[in-house]
Design a protein with these regions (language model features):
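Conserved long alpha-helical elements within nucleotide-processing catalytic cores of c-di-GMP signaling
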Residues: 49-71, 78-104, 113-117, 127-135, ...
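Hydrophobic scaffolding residues in well-structured cytosolic catalytic/regulatory domains
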Residues: 56, 120, 223
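A cytosolic-side transmembrane-helix exit/cap motif
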Residues: 40-52
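A short glycine-enriched loop-to-beta-strand structural element that forms part of the catalytic core
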Residues: 113-123, 140, 144-182, 187-196
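The cytosolic transmitter module of two-component sensor histidine kinases
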Residues: 24, 52, 92, 130, ...
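Short hydrophobic alpha-helical segments used for membrane anchoring or interfacial signaling
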Residues: 73-77, 160-162
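Interfacial "cap-and-anchor" motif at the non-cytosolic start of specific transmembrane alpha-helices
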Residues: 1-43
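Active-site core of bacterial EAL-family cyclic-dinucleotide phosphodiesterase domains
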Residues: 205-229
Length: 229
């Protein structure tokens, strides 16, 4: 926001030379640019050093706005909070950094984010890249992670969503993701669940029921229509 306003003011003065910004205005522009440069933490996860949930949402919204296509992979660390209790905060944070560095090296800049305490999210731009990442990530999690000479076996579930086939808006992305993670959690360790037509239909049916129930609660009742066969 700071950069956008500052750029607009500079552009205005360049385009319309008769409009001169005062010294106070110029100072404000410089302050806004300085704050933007000095505040990268807004988009960085302080634990892992990679992009955070805010950065991910900004990227995904931009991708959806440009009407492109691609894949979003969510890697959920099963039972991470139980492991956190055993290892303690410092070692758990080191474990997250190890995972973040691995995914960053594998996926590249602007493609991996630490979006929750027990979850990382990755962008894949093509089907081929998505398939490669699925295989590489699953293979890596089959081996232990080493933190302070402790060997840690981590279970994970990976869910894969394609846009715009599976979702076209942020709310739909989050709803579908939770539905897929719920299904993945029933399937055991190191599982990969990819949205397909059947799963999408199941999710949308359940979503309609949830909306109907919420409306019934709000309106304190609902109508039932019976059509004899």
């Amino acid at each position: 926001a700071y950069t956008a306003v500052a750029a607009a003011m500079i552009g205005l003065q360049y385009r319309y030379r008769e409009i001169l910004c005062t010294s106070v205005s110029n100072t404000v522009v410089l302050i806004m640019l300085y704050l933007q440069i000095q505040n990268p933490v807004v988009f960085l996860d302080t634990t892992t050093g990679i992009g955070n949930g805010t950065a991910f949402e900004s990227q995904l919204e931009d991708r959806l706005r440009r009407k492109g296509e691609g894949y979003v992979l969510t890697i959920h660390l099963s039972k991470f909070y139980h492991i956190h209790t055993i290892l303690g905060t410092e070692n758990s944070n080191e474990l997250l950094r190890e995972i973040g560095e691995y995914l960053y090296d594998l996926c590249g800049k602007f493609h991996v984010f630490h979006t929750a305490g027990d979850a990382f999210t990755v962008f894949a731009d093509t089907k081929e890249q998505c398939e490669r990442l699925k295989c590489e990530i699953q293979k890596r999690f089959e081996s232990d992670w080493v933190v302070q000479e402790n060997r840690i076996a981590l279970d994970m579930e990976t869910v894969v969503q394609h846009y715009p086939t599976d979702f076209k808006a942020m709310a739909e992305y989050y709803g579908m993701r939770e539905f897929l993670l719920e299904n993945a959690g029933k399937s055991g360790a190191q599982v990969i669940v990819e949205a397909d037509a059947d799963m999408i239909a199941q999710y949308r049916r359940r979503r309609k029921v949830e909306i109907a129930v919420a409306r019934a609660i709000r309106e304190k009742g609902f109508l039932v229509y019976y059509q004899p066969v």
